Structures are given as structure tokens and as C-alpha cells.
Amino acid sequence: LSGGYREWLLHHFEELNAEEVRRYDRQMILPQVGSEGQKKLKNSSVLIVGAGGLGSPAALYLAGAGVGTIGIMDADTVSISNLQRQIIHNMETEYVNKAESAKLSLQKLNDRIEIKAYPHALTVDNAEEIISKYDFIIDAVDNFETKFLINDVCVLLEKAFCHAGILQFEGQVMTYVPGNNPCYRCVFEEVPESGSIPNCSQAGII
């Protein structure tokens, strides 16, 4: 290609500026991504509910990949016991709200995307309004009530979402695509009885 790969992309795809081509060209080389895929990432939005051990790497990689709008929600604050696995936080943000701490890290990684922090919990009162603003939802929370809430609202709004859970050395992940596969409630039916499943502070986590 005359002028090189980057120049060809800039000429044919004006929605991606020169800096974006330099930043993302390693993944744009992949035929499964390309310039069209990168433009889709740029114009997409993802809400991550939970900025802990699951939400941390998810948020970092989505920001690095160039997802145009990332919302991150968490009512908790950073504690030193989080830092062993919640890599989006650091000692400087100890005692800071996790959503706000995550926003600081993501802005340092990629200041060309929009980061929205929600320093509060997802509730029955706000879930539909917030979730409706995003293309894709990531359930990275550590309580079953919120997992079922995310599922039910996403099913209602026909939003695709990814559920994930971790405990000790094990993990679980499933993706719901409206009209394509069973939802979280279809598989697990109802919230487990309180105290029947230990949490990370009781059972441990890597």
C-alpha cells in the first residue's frame, strides 16, 4: 500500500484520527477487528457494575481497547486488602470510592475516551435508567441480589450482558444475548439463601 498501512487507514476511515490509528493499530491489524471494528468500539458504551477483582481488569482492557464510553459503578471504598487483586486501584486511592478511583486510573490509561463514575450502588430505583444508557453491561458484583437485578433489567430492556463470579481459585462466566440464549435467572432461578455461600472475605480469593 502506497504511503504505508497507517496512511491508508487515515485516508479511508476519517472517523479514526492519527493518534487513534497509532494507538490501536496492533489490534486493527487483526482481520476480526480492522478499522470497522475499531470504529464500533469507539462508538460503543459499556457499563461495569463493580470495580473489584472482576471489574478492574475488565475496565482496564476495555479502556485500552478504545471503547468510547465506559461507566463504572461501585458504592464501596478502596481498602488495602483489595490491592492484591483489584489492580485498577493503588495506595494513593485507599479510602477513595472505587468508582472514582477506577476513573482516575482509566483516564491515565486512555484520556481520549469518556469515563463515567457512579459512586453508588445499583438499585431497583436507578437500574433501568442507568442500564438503558449503555450498549453492553458487565456484572462484576459480589452479591446475588444485584446479579439478579442486572439480569432482570437487561432482559426487560433487551440488553446483552456478561455475568462473572469468582471465589478462591474458581471462576464462572456467562454471556446473555437477547433472543439467543438463556438468561442468568433461567439458569439459577432465584437468589441463594442468605449465608449459604461464603463470600471472598470468608473463603479467600486469588
Which role fits each region the language model picked out?
Residues 2-206:
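Adenine nucleotide-associated cytosolic modules
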